[in-house]
From Swiss-Prot:
Assembly: Occurs in many kinds of cells as a complex with monomeric actin in a 1:1 ratio.
Key word Cytoplasm present: yes
Biological function: Binds to actin and affects the structure of the cytoskeleton. At high concentrations, profilin prevents the polymerization of actin, whereas it enhances it at low concentrations. By binding to PIP2, it inhibits the formation of IP3 and DG.
UniProt key word Cytoplasm: yes
PANTHER family reported in the protein's UniProt record: PROFILIN (PTHR11604), PROFILIN-2 (PTHR11604:SF49)
Pfam families reported in the protein's UniProt record: Profilin
Protein name listed in UniProt: Profilin-1
Source organism of the structure: Phaseolus vulgaris
Main location: cytoplasm
Sequence similarity: Belongs to the profilin family.
Expression sites (tissue/organ): Cytoplasmic distribution in hypocotyls. In root nodules, it is found in all cells, but is more abundant in the vascular tissue as well as the endodermis.
Subcellular location: Cytoplasm, Cytoskeleton
Length: 131
């Protein structure tokens, strides 16, 4: 299965009539493995900030989580495993696997819990596969 299939079928799936707005799977170096068509362009320093927060949880909280220049307020995540951000009626979930970052961006009417479930479920599956 290609990485794009994981994005198209597992991240952009429908859940209770809702879909993620954007989704991507990136290498931990920031290389794009697969993404939705309109996923924002990451800046190298944004990937560095995310990886630093996974290695030293809490480092993003004072400055915010940036994806494609958009700032998200960091909210409760799972240290070293999941970073969650909120911006207005939407937000983002970033799940770290052994080799990758699984990212989902949502907007209303999707809920934070729905986004978390989709992103973390795929991330957990990839971890089980050694990825």
């Amino acid at each position: 299965m290609s990485w794009q299939t994981y994005v198209d079928d597992h991240l952009l799936c429908e859940i209770e009539g809702n879909h993620l707005t954007h989704a991507a799977i990136l290498g931990q170096d920031g290389s794009v493995w697969a993404k939705s068509a309109s996923f924002p362009q990451f800046k190298p320093e944004e990937i560095t900030g995310i990886m630093n927060d996974f290695n030293e949880p809490g480092t993003l909280a004072p400055t915010g989580l940036y994806i494609g220049g958009t700032k998200y307020m960091v909210i409760q995540g799972e240290p070293g495993s999941v970073i969650r951000g909120k911006k207005g009626p939407g937000g983002v979930t970033v799940k770290k696997t052994n080799l990758a970052l699984v990212i989902g961006i949502y907007d209303e009417p999707m809920t934070p819990g729905q986004c978390n479930m989709i992103v973390e479920r795929l991330g957990d599956y990839l971890i089980e596969q050694g990825l």
